[in-house]
């Protein structure tokens, strides 16, 4: 298959005002996507966004390009990424377009696509869009131009969908939950879902101003949530990222719970309830402790490439339901086609109800191996992973670990970073090994 030129592992992403996140490129991308969709005989797409100020500019540019290709647009306004995937299916739209850079700062943005079935676009379709991006843009005749309108009840529809996955016989009454929405796309949704299911809710990160998304809050910055949980003596905390597809949690004692621990709790509870179908899919970054703990319980476990799209592909291939990443993407195909932070949180709350345990007790049997991740920035034309010095130091560290840990080096699919991950039983040694490799990677970028 051809190499992608514009699309990364999660659509097109970058700094606003710098190629490819410019109004000119967004118009062309809308047109190219519209041409591909129009060729399939479909004429409407949904467009949603997170709360970045640049979202208004990009949605207007996309709409212009789509209209020129003869494709109409239904605007959803601020909407979590998984909400856009869900509504794309229920509205029988040709595609859903998400304007978001997920957990990145406000000055970044991105554009990604869902197919009509709520899954990420197949590689072949993305490549066809890329091919058209390199062709001159044209415009349909006036009678065939796409038209735009807004869907005013989109948030309410998604709230009801989220509530529908929480079993009717259960309630959140008696639970005090702090929810941090990262000043992002879930700000008007997650607190309402939890309240309508009976919880007492304290909300933070729910005052977006276009520039504060993910700023010292949300799933990538847990300190604010930890402090609020302890201050209010809440039962637990839930942190979502800017577009709502990632979740982290905090116990009543302020202890952070990541995606690996959430997968462990959900898998074990599903097994106890006789509801686990097949096994669990993680990624190359999944903590080795999860693999070992699931093996003890005879729950199959496989690793996919990093990226929720690859986890989903592996789940579909094996007809399993449960998978995710330590970063907080958690997928349950029984409920949704993509990772959904709100739904993953509701599943954990349901597990607490079923097991009659607090979040602290539900997660206390799982002990992660020390894992250190160092990001090394590099110029896009460099190839540090091909360096013989880097390969040599990796072999040296793997030999020293002697099968009690792992080393993983990989390029980020969304940023110009090399991710250096080392895992093992001794935290001090793991830190030293990771720094040793990172230093060599950095030297190879100069």
Swiss-Prot record:
InterPro entries, alphabetized: A-D-PHexomutase_a/b/a-I (IPR005844), A-D-PHexomutase_a/b/a-I/II/III (IPR016055), A-D-PHexomutase_a/b/a-II (IPR005845), A-D-PHexomutase_a/b/a-III (IPR005846), A-D-PHexomutase_C (IPR005843), A-D-PHexomutase_C_sf (IPR036900), A-D-PHexomutase_CS (IPR016066), Alpha-D-phosphohexomutase_SF (IPR005841)
A GO cellular component annotation in the UniProt record: cytosol
Gene3D superfamilies: Alpha-D-Glucose-1,6-Bisphosphate, subunit A, domain 3 (3.40.120.10), Alpha-D-phosphohexomutase, C-terminal domain (3.30.310.50)
Enzyme Commission number(s) of this protein: 5.4.2.10
Catalytic residues (positions): 102
Entry keywords, A to Z: Isomerase, Magnesium, Metal-binding, Phosphoprotein
Cofactor note: Binds 1 Mg(2+) ion per subunit.
Top EC class for this record: isomerase
Binding locations of Mg(2+): 102, 241, 243, 245
Keyword Metal-binding annotated: yes
UniProt key word Electron transport: no
Sites of Phosphoserine modification: 102
Family recorded in the similarity comment: Belongs to the phosphohexose mutase family.
Protein name, per record: Phosphoglucosamine mutase
């Amino acid at each position: 298959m051809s190499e992608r030129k514009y699309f990364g592992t999660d659509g097109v992403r970058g700094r606003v005002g710098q190629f490819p996140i410019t109004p000119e490129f967004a118009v062309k991308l809308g047109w190219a996507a519209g041409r591909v969709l129009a060729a399939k005989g479909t004429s409407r797409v949904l467009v949603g966004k997170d709360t970045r100020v640049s979202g208004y500019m990009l949605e207007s540019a996309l709409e212009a390009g789509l209209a020129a290709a003869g494709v109409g647009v239904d605007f959803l306004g601020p909407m979590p990424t998984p909400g856009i995937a869900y509504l794309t299916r229920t509205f029988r739209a040709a595609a859903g377009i998400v304007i978001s850079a997920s957990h990145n700062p406000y000055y970044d943005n991105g554009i990604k696509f869902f197919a009509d079935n709520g899954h990420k676009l197949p590689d072949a379709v993305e490549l066809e869009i890329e091919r058209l991006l390199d062709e001159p843009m044209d415009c349909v005749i006036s009678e065939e131009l796409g038209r735009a309108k807004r869907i005013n009840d989109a948030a309410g529809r998604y709230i009801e969908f989220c509530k529908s996955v929480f079993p009717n016989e259960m309630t959140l009454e008696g639970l005090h939950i702090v929810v941090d929405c990262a000043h992002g796309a879930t700000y008007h949704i997650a607190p309402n879902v939890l309240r309508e299911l009976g919880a007492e809710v304290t909300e933070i990160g729910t005052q977006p101003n276009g520039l504060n998304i993910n700023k010292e809050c949300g799933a990538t910055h847990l300190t604010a949530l930890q402090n609020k949980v302890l201050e209010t003596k809440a039962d637990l905390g839930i942190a979502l990222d800017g577009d709502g597809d990632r979740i982290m949690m905090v116990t009543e004692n302020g202890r952070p719970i990541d995606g690996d621990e959430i997968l462990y709790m959900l898998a074990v509870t599903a097994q106890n309830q006789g509801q686990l179908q097949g096994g669990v899919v993680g990624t190359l970054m999944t903590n080795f402790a999860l693999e070992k703990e699931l093996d003890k319980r005879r729950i199959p476990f496989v690793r996919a490439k990093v990226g929720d799209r690859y986890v989903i592909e592996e789940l579909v291939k094996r007809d399993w339901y449960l998978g995710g990443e330590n970063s907080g993407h958690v997928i349950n195909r029984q409920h949704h086609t993509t990772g959904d932070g709100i739904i993953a949180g509701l599943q954990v709350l349901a597990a607490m109800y079923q097991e009659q345990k607090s979040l602290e007790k539900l997660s206390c049997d799982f002990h992660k191996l020390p894992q250190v991740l160092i990001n090394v920035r590099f110029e896009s034309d460099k190839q540090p992973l091909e360096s013989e010095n880097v390969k040599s130091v990796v072999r040296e560290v793997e030999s020293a670990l002697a099968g009690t840990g792992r080393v993983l080096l990989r390029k980020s699919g969304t940023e110009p970073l090399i991710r250096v991950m080392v895992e093992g039983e001794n935290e001090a040694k793991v830190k030293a090994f990771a720094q040793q490799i990172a230093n060599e990677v950095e030297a190879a970028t100069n």
